[in-house]
UniProtKB/Swiss-Prot annotation:
GO terms for molecular function: phosphatidylinositol binding; ubiquitin binding; ubiquitin-protein transferase activity; ubiquitin-ubiquitin ligase activity. PANTHER family: E3 UBIQUITIN-PROTEIN LIGASE NEDD-4, HECT DOMAIN UBIQUITIN-PROTEIN LIGASE. GO terms for cellular component: cellular bud tip; cytosolic ribosome; endosome membrane; Golgi apparatus; nucleus; RSP5-BUL ubiquitin ligase complex; ubiquitin ligase complex. Pathway: Protein modification; protein ubiquitination. The gene is hulA. Residues 311-339 have a biased composition (Low complexity). It comes from Aspergillus niger (strain ATCC MYA-4892 / CBS 513.88 / FGSC A1513). This is Probable E3 ubiquitin-protein ligase hulA. PROSITE patterns: C2, HECT, WW_DOMAIN_1, WW_DOMAIN_2. SUPFAM superfamilies: C2 domain (Calcium/lipid-binding domain, CaLB), Hect, E3 ligase catalytic domain, WW domain. It holds the Pfam family WW. CDD domains: C2_Smurf-like, HECTc, WW. Belongs to the RSP5/NEDD4 family. Keywords: Cytoplasm, Repeat, Transferase, Ubl conjugation pathway.
Length: 821
């Protein structure tokens, strides 16, 4: 046939792309390349596209053909090219005369289904090619393409060069240049070398729902990052992909990112207005967050002091009038005293004119008028099924305080008690039945007691003096870095006084709350490459393993650790939430396979499959993993000599543990240690370890006020209908629960207590928008189960309201860890 071929090439073949290739390996995507052959004499090979089922080559080859020539294009996986099946992924065979007239000339675009070979391996997907008789334009320089003989293709497959699937465009420094108040190193991605993959830099910050991830992909188009299939992006915008292949958009004008493509009629003012509206919603939600200790509203933005009693500032509450029981329960105040003092009591006045009372019976003094009535709040269920009961009892009839105890008032006239024996304070009167009685769920008793113990420790006491931090709102990250890193840890433990440049206002709590709210939005912004959004959704965070793109990244992680510690120390909340494994790492707990769900849901599923099935002869693995940074791919041994140790049924448990440890901990160990070094300067490790990982999330982020109506409105049902008795009982129970119980239910079912800024309608799962779902599943004697990656609750058909509440409470309150399945 070769003698009938023309002397010069007469057909240009462009191998454009393949789509939907078969994934043979449980744990890895293939590294596809294509081999084009005519008559066994002319062979051309494309470049290798790493880790994708949808490779895009767009590479051209000129061939000598006649109408009877058969063009065969085979696709192989480079990883398996030396194995028996050569990593075969499919083939197409095209008779040239059937698709194009070589005499008349022409240009034909073909999309053909991939076919099996003789060994009958499973194949699916399509191949897109172009045939053209126009050879007048030279083939562009294909630096990555290989033109080799058939012998070279079959014997030197290991030499196929590794190709970065995408390149990072240079960014004009003027597009996102900050003022570097903290250091001379820019925080922004324009310093990234031009070879950096966009998947290793940033992820979305806010905006609309995420498109479903398609897995790691190679470059699918030769479009620049400033345009896409719909045309050029507005000025200052850039298109990128995260590490899961999800497309997002970077607005260099405002240093923000979003999942939503900017419209062609993009208006910066409209976008700014929308961002400000969202910020206000988030601010209100953030300021309403609280902890069990602060139920009385001590964390309200309107108060001028933190809930920690400040005895030296206490004063006598206003006399006269009375309040309702509900009001008194909310404030902890007492009614005004009238009539004569009880026997043995005397009223005196300090040199400053402040009245106090002497109890000659016990030889003690107090600021509290013994004639006043105190409303005592006790937890537990009353006869009507309520959550609290109110008792009214004269203080004078309670008898003396236990030895070493003292009663005091806050500056808002709320009674609290000092235990000088343990140097702790509490709102609970030690003479009364404890509000932490046996009727309270175990988790609530433990969390409140832990909080009281934690905040009473000497290391958590505010030191004398003030710590002044002055920042500009529009430069809060850099200014905060400079201010907080220049001060010693002991200075940061003084009373925090925040000052916003150009604004009047004294910090009695409101400014510091605003400071931590704004700073948490900025420093956790994936735009800076320090953190990225998890595989679970687009609002929980994890450390970016490629943060080294910023040479100063370890200093910034230490700074962020200080900020988190500073917020806990001064009883403020951050508007940021991390994956469950991050909290476990903070507590120095060992991570488990369940924690992998929030990091890499596909890998979690594959590792779980490996543990549950026989892998002999099915999966070929070694104790090593492939890692890719900035286009450079390396093999990392999970144990000494791991790349030469095969994984078997006997050692697969160890393999899963080592992969989990590497994926979650080892990849970011350097950054995490820097974070913890800053955190532990303010919060000692032995103190924070009293909490579990779910409690630590609440300690850092607070407890949200959850709108049950909005939650119910955006819930789907499988096997149930909204009118079913079980569903009606479920929502009745949720409505009776307090904010802490609701937050724990949210943690149990979604993996985090965070609610999207626009409510439950924007709830995200591992594969994009995912509404909260209740599925009819399980035996009525079993506990409910959750699937946090899919925001799903498996709820058995319990017969009665009481059984449902009991089972749900046990599942929510006693389950440890984030991975419920």
């Amino acid at each position: 046939m070769g003698s009938n071929l023309p002397a010069q090439p007469n057909l240009r073949v462009t191998i454009i792309a393949a789509d939907g290739l078969y994934k043979r390996d449980v744990f890895r995507f293939p590294d596809p390349f294509a081999v084009a052959t005519v008559g066994g004499e002319q062979t051309h090979t494309t470049s290798v596209i790493k880790k994708t089922l949808n490779p895009y080559w767009n590479e051209m080859f000129d061939l000598r053909v006649n109408e009877d020539s058969i063009l065969a294009i085979q696709i192989f996986d480079q990883k398996k090219f030396k194995k028996k099946d050569q990593g075969f992924l499919g083939v197409i065979n095209v008779r040239i005369g059937d698709v194009i007239d070589l005499q008349m000339g022409g240009d034909e675009m073909l999309t053909r289904d991939l076919k099996k070979s003789n060994d009958n391996l499973v194949v699916h997907g399509k191949l897109i090619i172009n045939l053209s008789t126009n050879l007048s334009t030279p083939i562009p320089n294909q630096a990555n393409g290989l033109h080799r003989s058939h012998a070279q293709s079959s014997t030197s497959s290991g030499l196929v060069p590794q190709v970065s699937s995408a390149s990072h465009p240079s960014v004009s420094p003027g597009q996102a240049e900050p003022s570097a108040a903290a250091s001379n190193v820019s925080l922004h991605p324009q310093r990234v070398p031009s070879t950096t993959r966009p998947t290793s830099t940033v992820g979305p910050v806010n905006g609309g729902p995420a498109p479903p991830p398609n897995g790691p992909q190679g470059s699918r188009t030769n479009l620049s990052s400033f345009e896409d299939s719909q045309g050029r992006l507005p000025a200052g915008w850039e298109r990128r992909e995260d590490n899961l292949g999800r497309t997002y958009y970077v607005d260099h004008n405002t240093r923000t990112t979003t999942w939503t493509r900017p419209s062609s009629n993009y208006n910066e003012q409209t976008q700014r207005t929308q961002r400000e509206a969202n910020m206000q919603l988030e601010r209100r939600a953030h300021q309403s967050r609280m902890l069990p200790e602060d139920r009385t509203g001590a964390n309200s933005p309107n108060l001028q002091e933190s809930p920690q009693p400040q005895p030296q500032q206490a004063h006598t509450p206003p006399a006269g009038g009375s309040a309702s029981a509900v009001s008194m329960m909310a404030t902890g105040a007492t009614t005004a005293g009238t009539g004569e003092l009880p026997p043995g009591w005397e009223q005196r006045t300090t040199p400053e004119g402040r009245p106090y009372f002497v109890d000659h019976n016990t030889r003690t003094t107090t600021w509290v008028d013994p004639r006043r009535q105190q409303y005592i709040r006790m937890y537990g269920h009353n006869a009507n099924g309520g959550n609290t009961t109110i008792q009214q009892q004269p203080v004078s009839q309670l008898g003396p305080l236990p030895s070493g105890w003292e009663m005091r008032l806050t500056n808002t006239a709320r009674v609290y008690f000092v235990d000088h024996n343990t140097k702790t304070t509490t709102w609970d009167d030690p003479r009364l039945p404890s509000s932490l009685d046996q009727g309270v769920p175990q988790y609530k008793r433990d969390f409140r007691r832990k909080l009281i113990y934690f905040r009473s420790q000497p290391a958590l006491r505010i030191m004398s003096g003030q710590c002044h931090v002055k920042v500009r709102r529009n430069n809060i990250f850099e200014d905060s870095y400079a201010e907080i890193m220049r001060q010693s840890a002991s200075d940061l433990k003084k009373r925090l006084m925040i000052k916003f440049d150009g604004e009047d206002g004294l910090d009695y709590g409101g400014l510091s709350r605003e400071f931590f709210f704004l700073l948490s939005h900025e420093m956790f912004n994936p735009f800076y490459c320090l953190f990225e959004y998890s595989a679970h959704d687009n609002y929980t965070l994890q450390i970016n393993p490629h943060s080294g793109v910023n040479p100063e990244h370890l200093n910034y992680f230490k700074f962020i650790g200080r900020v988190v510690g500073l917020a806990i120390f001064h009883r403020r909340f951050l508007d940021s939430f991390f994956i469950g494994a991050f909290y476990k790492m903070m507590l120095r707990k060992k991570v488990s396979l369940q924690d992998m769900e929030g990091v890499d849901e596909d890998l979690h599923r594959n590792l779980a499959w490996t543990l549950e099935n026989d892998i002999e002869g099915i999966i070929e693995l070694t104790f090593s993993v492939d890692d890719e940074k900035f286009g450079e791919r390396t093999t990392i041994d999970l144990k000494p000599g791991g790349r030469d140790i095969p994984v078997t049924n006997e050692n697969k448990g160890e393999y899963v543990e080592l992969v989990t440890e590497w994926k979650i901990v080892k990849r970011v160990e350097e950054q995490f240690n820097a974070f913890m070094s800053g955190f532990n300067e303010l919060i000692p490790a032995d103190l924070v370890n009293v909490f579990d990982e779910r409690e630590l999330e609440l300690l850092i982020g607070g407890i949200a006020d959850i709108d049950v109506d909005d939650w119910k409105k955006h819930t789907d049902y499988r096997g149930y209908q909204e009118q079913d008795e079980v569903i009606q009982n479920f929502w009745k129970i949720v409505r009776t629960w307090d904010a802490e119980q609701k937050s724990r239910l949210l943690q149990f079912t979604t993996g985090t207590s965070r609610i999207p800024v626009n409510g439950f309608k924007d709830l995200q799962g591992s594969d994009g928008p995912r509404r909260f779902t209740i599925e009819k599943s399980g035996d009525p004697i079993a506990l409910p189960k959750s699937h946090t990656c899919f925001n799903r609750l498996d709820l058995p058909p319990y017969k009665t309201h009481d059984v449902l509440e009991h089972k749900l409470s046990i599942a929510v309150e006693e389950t440890l860890g984030f991975g419920q399945e």
